[in-house]
Amino acid sequence: MSAALFCGPPPAVSFGCKDGRGRKGMVRSKDIVRQTVKPPAHACRLIGWNKYPGSVVPTNSSLSPSPTALDDDIELDLSPFLIIYKDGRIERLKGTTVIPACPEVATKDVIIDPATGVSVRLYLPNVVDLPSKKLPVLVYFHGGGFVIENTGSPNYHNYLTLLAAKSGLLIVSVNYRLAPEHPIPASFDDCMAGFNWVVSHSAGPAPEPWLARHGDLTQILISGDSAGGTVTHYVLLRADAGVIEGAALVHPYFLGSKRLENQTEEDFEFHEKLWRLSTPNTEGLDDPLINPLAPGAPSLAGLKCKRAVVFVAELDFLVERGRMYYDALVKSGWGGEAELVHQEGVGHVFHLSDYSGDVSVDMMAKMVAFLRGE
């Protein structure tokens, strides 16, 4: 893999968990961008929680706290994701940096719905040496707890560039609207729209020439990490039968009202608050959107794909939920092929910031093999 395939250097320092368990051991990279937006007046007034304790203190950061960012001004602190102030401002602490699409590596951005602003970023591998046959298409949904990240985030752009080069697939990454400005189900609807936009190229005139010329629309796969894994499950239940060849759920963001043994009380409460912030009208952590195993949730037997793989990480807060999902899928009567990949000694979405470690290399190899059907 040549470094020339990247639009800029891979991130040197990730903003994540050293041990994968929630927010413990957080550090901030020097190039972090703080994004503050002013939402509609009604956007955050339903929040009734006090300031969340245990805020993360920036380490090795060039940023100084805002003079207005006093504790008394804060409505809800969901560090390291975002802070909501009493005047309605929303400050995102990570996942706001955008790497532009690079023609040199065959990437480009396309707006698919001007009304909502939903767009996709396409990755076309090895343009000069493309084979005469068309390429399978992977529709990808990024993570970020539904409140941060985008298709231009450095970690996602670099990872998907590498994945496209290694797998030889044409990748379509969906840039969906974020909560709380756009409460769930907006993100789910946007991802479904992105998927349907790709599928639409198989019938009639195709609006996107890359998909028309190079995409094999008889071989569509979908994947997502964390919140994107949650969306992947959502799309699998709603796609037309026979359209999706395979699905890869990476460290899926599945929750539930019962705290599991591997989950600390602090992390459990944090993610409950994050979910309620994103989904004001939710039924709670047993909402079928976030808990596919909740009573009344659609049967996993209804997943619309031929094969599926679930990746879990030993030190991830979500590891047991991922394993439970896999076990339930196998027992559901679903007629496809299921695989579980359990990786030890690593935490949540470790592969987005470490491309050269042994476990990351192994994960990439397993992902590529799955996407290729090997």
Swiss-Prot record:
Entry-linked SUPFAM superfamilies: alpha/beta-Hydrolases
Keywords, ordered alphabetically: Amyloplast, Lyase, Plant defense, Plastid, Transit peptide
Assigned protein family: Belongs to the AB hydrolase superfamily.
Cellular compartments per GO CC: amyloplast
Known role: Lactone-forming carboxylesterases, specifically catalyzing intramolecular transesterification, but not hydrolysis. Involved in the biosynthesis of tulipalins, defensive chemicals that show antimicrobial activities against a broad range of strains of bacteria and fungi. Substrates are 6-tuliposide A > 6-tuliposide B.
Active site: 226, 316, 348
InterPro entries in UniProt: AB_hydrolase_3, AB_hydrolase_fold, Carboxylest/Gibb_receptor
EC number(s) on file: 4.2.99.22
Lineage: Eukaryota, Viridiplantae, Streptophyta, Embryophyta, Tracheophyta
Catalytic activity as recorded in UniProt: 6-tuliposide A = tulipalin A + D-glucose
GO molecular function annotation: hydrolase activity; lyase activity
Subunit structure: Homodimer.
Any further remark recorded for this protein: 6-tuliposide A and tuliposide A-converting enzyme, which are compartmentalized in the vacuoles and plastids respectively, come into contact with each other for the enzyme reaction releasing toxic tulipalin A upon cell disruption by pathogen infection or herbivore predation.
GO annotation terms (biological process): defense response
Expressed in which tissues: Highly expressed in pistil and bulb scales. Lower expression in stem, and barely detected in root, leaf, petal and stamen.
Compartments reported by the entry: Plastid, Amyloplast
Pfam families listed in its UniProt record: Abhydrolase_3
Main localisation: plastid
Protein name from the UniProt record: Tuliposide A-converting enzyme b3, amyloplastic
Record: transit peptide: 1-68
